Design a protein with these regions (language model features):
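C-terminal nucleotide
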Residues: 25, 46, 54-194, 208-241
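Short alpha-helical patches at coil-to-helix transitions and adjacent helical residues
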Residues: 1-2, 20, 39, 177
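Broad gene-expression machinery/nucleic-acid interaction feature
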Residues: 41, 73, 205
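Alpha/beta catalytic cores of group-transfer enzymes, especially the acyltransferase/condensing modules
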Residues: 12-67, 195-198
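DPxDG-like acidic metal-binding loop motif
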Residues: 1-15
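Short Gly/Ser/Thr- and Asp/Glu-enriched loop/turn motifs at secondary-structure junctions
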Residues: 199-203
Length: 241
């Protein structure tokens, strides 16, 4: 969709010179908003801009380019269908309701400001677990940003942070599957530094971070029943002349 929009913008009777952020915005509107479909905007912005990015969507779109050289990832397709609506209810809708509930005792609280210091007395145990999982994910993100912006990245730390993030997705948000777990375990045993389920979860794909011996890790994921693709960071959409 991103490349198609870029192409059409140049082939129009009156071509427009949209920047990469504008192309990403239109792709997101076409894929999600137009059809009232759930989902984030990271795919469209990453595809358009290229490389590694950090995207903040609130209060407005803010994008930070990350010039990290991480090497090879292996995308593993479990071939399992995804139950996106069920997953998003747990991951998105439930957490939005959680923030509304917390607002009563914690005026102004949001996903960016939430911490363990807020008043949680009106939450039940399941809601508290979901809340602390949200905080943990935020902490993992901040640790990863610090590491990725270093001149010399510790690739094993990046792998460990991916594992930590997956633990939250599996144990608290409950979006992993038995097959995905088997594929991740096989990847780690074969030498991957880390990995996690990809996208909304509930099936679909996982990825493993394996800058060393990626072919060995890919073979292990195949043996666990997945289809594999070796992937690297690349440039975004562009017009070749």
């Amino acid at each position: 969709m991103v490349s198609w929009i870029h192409f059409l913008s140049q082939m129009a009777d009156e071509p427009v010179l949209w920047d990469l952020k504008k192309i990403a915005e239109i792709a997101y509107r076409a894929e999600s908003l137009e059809f009232n479909e759930p989902g984030g905007m990271m795919d469209q912005y990453t595809t358009s801009i290229g490389g590694f990015i950090h995207l903040e969507s609130q209060p407005s779109i803010k994008i930070e380019k990350i010039n990290a050289k991480l090497g090879t990832f292996i995308l593993g397709d479990s071939l399992e269908p995804k139950d996106t609506m069920r997953v998003l209810f747990r991951c998105k809708d439930s957490r939005l309701e959680l923030m509304k509930k917390l607002e009563f005792r914690n005026p102004g609280i949001d996903f960016k400001s939430c911490s363990s210091n807020h008043d949680l007395t009106n939450l039940d145990n399941d809601e508290k677990e979901l809340y602390f999982g949200t905080i943990k994910n935020k902490e993992i993100l901040n640790e990863a940003l610090l590491e990725l912006n270093k001149d010399k990245i510790d690739h094993k730390i990046i792998g460990e942070l991916l594992n930590d993030h997956h633990s939250v997705l599996r144990d608290i948000l409950q979006i992993s599957t038995e097959k995905i777990e088997n594929m991740l375990e096989a990847a780690l045993n074969a030498g991957a530094y880390g990995g996690k389920i990809n996208g909304s979860g509930g099936g679909g794909c996982m990825f493993a971070y394996a800058p060393d011996n990626p072919e060995k890790v890919a073979e292990a994921i195949k043996n666990a029943g997945g289809e594999t693709y070796l992937i690297h960071s690349d440039i975004g959409t562009q017009i070749e002349k």
